[in-house]
Swiss-Prot record:
Membrane topology, record value: Peripheral membrane protein
Protein name: NADH-quinone oxidoreductase subunit D
Family affiliation: Belongs to the complex I 49 kDa subunit family.
InterPro entries for the chain: NADH_Q_OxRdtase_suD, NADH_UbQ_OxRdtase_49kDa_CS, NDH1_su_D/H, NiFe-Hase_large
Pfam families associated with the record: Complex1_49kDa
Native source organism of the sequence: Nitrosomonas europaea (strain ATCC 19718 / CIP 103999 / KCTC 2705 / NBRC 14298)
Length: 417
């Protein structure tokens, strides 16, 4: 008699729905998944080890490259941990700028997640719409830091520089003539705050467009409802955070429960799911984009009325201005020491966590009093989510695996570190 056995199949690391370099070794009974074993490490770059050989400020750009879709939020956790060790106050204007860019980054992340998730499931249009909006937010990154992706904008003690008074302008090219260029530059005539305010006015309408395409779409609901269900207790036991935890009905958000920066001074709600399935996690992230938009509006309003310093005046931590450095010998020494040797952080240890678009992103630093960390540990939210993939997919069809990976919002930069 013929023996009936499950067969083993590789999913990824080249599969377009694998979100980077995910490799799954799956045990299948026909089309039903019996086991899904994630193999990680293909994007390991030894970030934690590299940070031990760099000064504290030199490691800021490494943070951008962890979750390379949520750049500034990674930096935020890192500089907050350093500030805890240094026990320095961050100027209130810098705190508002950080919160504003954290929420811009959250929208950037969720737009990419939405576009990629819909594309994996088979809806192409949303992907194109999402990238149209991402372009405007990338321009905000570029205006403050000069880079569209790896900004390296946050610094221990504040941010690199204040918000610019004018936006970069498009130039005529072979593709766009003078008239088309004028139309493209229409909302770029004012400052960065004007540009962001214009975006916040338009964005709720765009979210309505995404929802019109997906939320009540029969095929979308058939692919997501009752797929990858996780109960509230199980979500907590598995170490879920962020939208994955809130999608299961647990109202936990670090911005509300353990407020940092000025999150206790802005108004927003925590969206929570009811059933803990892929569809609930989709709805939670959609509503998070609306809440982020609301927070950005409040930050823009406050920043308009309150000019001020954007980085600490402690020159043992932050460099003096270029003008002061060229006029004063003491400032020049500070500048030279900071950029050659770096700052010496007091002996001790600190953990700082932020509400990252994917969950709780934490940085744990151990300092031995030198100008480099003795040890840096990164707590990546996606790591716990990926570890639960086997449990979430068991008993589902192979087509549902793609929907579950999409709903986890996995980026391998932070998982492999």
């Amino acid at each position: 008699m013929a023996e009936i056995r499950n067969y083993t199949m590789n999913f990824g690391p080249q599969h377009p729905a694998a979100h980077g370099v995910l490799r799954l070794v799956m045990e299948l009974d026909g089309e039903v998944i019996r086991r899904a074993d994630p193999h990680i490490g293909l994007l390991h770059r030894a970030t934690e080890k590299l940070a031990e050989n760099k000064t504290y400020v030199q490691s800021v750009p490494y943070m951008d490259r962890l979750d390379y879709v949520s750049m500034m939020v990674n930096e935020h956790a890192y500089v907050m941990a350093i500030e805890k060790l240094l026990q320095i106050e961050v100027p209130i204007r810098a705190q508002y700028i950080r919160v504003m860019f954290d929420e811009i980054t959250r929208i950037l992340n969720h737009l990419l997640w939405l576009g990629a998730h819909a594309l994996d499931v088979g809806a192409m249009t949303v992907f194109l719409y999402a990238f149209r909006e991402r372009e405007d937010l990338m321009d905000c990154y570029e205006a403050v830091s000069g880079a569209r992706l790896h900004a390296a904008y946050y610094r221990p003690g504040g941010v690199y520089r204040d918000l610019p008074d004018n936006m970069p302008q498009y130039q005529p090219s072979a593709i766009h003539d003078e008239k088309a260029t004028r139309a493209r530059n229409e909302n770029r005539q004012g400052s960065l705050l004007d540009f962001i305010e214009d975006f916040t006015r338009r964005f709720p309408g765009y979210i309505d467009d995404y929802e019109a395409l997906l939320t009540d779409n029969r095929i979308w609901k058939q692919r997501l409802v009752d797929i990858g269900v996780v109960s509230p207790d199980r979500a907590k036991a598995l170490g879920f955070t962020g939208p994955m935890l809130r999608g299961s009905g647990v109202e936990w958000d670090l911005r509300k429960k353990q407020p940092y920066e000025v999150y206790d001074q802005v108004d927003f709600d925590i969206p929570v799911g009811a059933n803990g399935d892929c569809y609930d996690r989709y709805l939670v992230r959609i509503e998070e984009m609306r809440q982020s938009n609301h927070i950005i509006k409040q930050c823009v309003e406050w920043l308009r009325k309150n000019p001020g310093p954007v980085i600490t005046d402690n020159h043992k931590v932050a460099p003096p201005s270029r003008l002061a450095m060229k006029q004063n010998m003491e400032e020049m020494i500070h500048h030279f020491k900071l950029f050659t040797e770096g700052m010496h952080v007091p002996r001790g240890e600190a953990y700082a966590a932020v509400e990252h678009p994917k969950g709780e992103f934490g940085i744990y630093i151990v300092s031995d009093g030198a100008n480099k960390p003795y040890r840096l540990k990164i707590r990546a939210p996606g790591f716990a989510h990926l570890a639960a993939l086997d449990e979430m997919t068991k008993g589902h069809m192979i087509a549902d695996l793609v929907a579950i990976i999409g709903t986890q919002d996995i980026v391998f930069g932070e998982i492999d570190r």
